UniProtKB/Swiss-Prot annotation:
Organism encoding this protein: Mus musculus
Keyword annotations of the record: Cell membrane, Golgi apparatus, Kinase, Lipid metabolism, Lipoprotein, Membrane, Palmitate, Sphingolipid metabolism, Transferase, Transmembrane, Transmembrane helix
Tissue note: Highest expression is detected in cortical bone, followed by vertebrae, kidney and liver. Expression levels are very low in spleen, muscle, heart, brown fat and thymus. Expressed in macrophages.
Membrane topology: Multi-pass membrane protein
Entry protein name: Phosphatidylcholine:ceramide cholinephosphotransferase 2
Amino acid sequence: MDIIETAKLEGHLESQTNDSTNTYTSPTEAVEEEGKNGKGKPKTLSNGLRKGAKKYPDYIQISMPNDSKNKFPLEWWKTGIAFVYALFNLILTTVMITVVHERVPPKELSPPLPDKFFDYFDRVKWAFSVSEINGMVLVGLWITQWLFLRYKSIVGRRFFFIMGTLYLYRCITMYVTTLPVPGMHFQCAPKLNGDSQAKIQRILRLISGGGLSITGSHILCGDFLFSGHTVVLTLTYLFIKEYSPRHFWWYHLVCWLLSAAGIICILVAHEHYTVDVIIAYYITTRLFWWYHSMANEKNLKVSSQTNFLSRAWWFPIFYFFEKNVQGSIPCCFSWPLSWPPGCFKSSCRKYSRVQKIGEDNEKST
């Protein structure tokens, strides 16, 4: 009787095992069946995965969804276009300064216009040098910060586009209205009276010296409406603050002090009228805020009857640069150059749990 009961028990267990085997589909069979049915491309598992699945059948294959579309594509070629746009307008500005310089009336015939700030504050000679030094420090800080940004290509083309557009506006304003020099201390270079070769030399001198007075390259007059120094001081601070962590308040404060002191020194040096500085600050901040509001809000990227910002002349250019950027850019940093390079990195050192089990099984057998 014991033998008969044991045989019945073994038969019962064998039938249960067969039933469970018939209802269970191994990962390898699932993949092959999927390929046969045409639901996907035929796939085969690696030896490690196959052996690991046989040894440990509780591991089942989970089909992972395809990688979602990158929300922040780098698109460096667009950044290159924005850089060319900014460079063109900067060169155009030097050409326009050279042209306008020939139209500036002599200070003996057209004295400086009345300015309330000049009435209350006397001129300080060294103040303009402080302004230019502050500007160079801010530019240096911004370039360094930009190099460590993870999405530097997107931020870079925003900076180049805004900077180029501001200098395009500056070309227009200084050409249509030529103001007399703000002070009798100005020593303007002599007029060339149609000497094209000498004008080209002046343009190259302005470009090589960055248009700065401390480099001795800015000896021309007429570029008063509006202040290019104020544009640089304001725009670099706005980008530094926007693309740095919010808890870096001390960093923001130092940059704000550099920017504010530089703008005040422009007026203290009597190098620009007060209206030049006010207009430069207003246009720079508004263009920066409008652009980033449109870039961060999906609804503002679409031209519609209710989106009045889409009626700006530069909206098609904005849409070209920002149409693939989904949402606000996170404040992330990364090394400018990865080390070690990708050619020295071995992907064979990375294993999944199942692959590791499969290799252990091979060694044991």
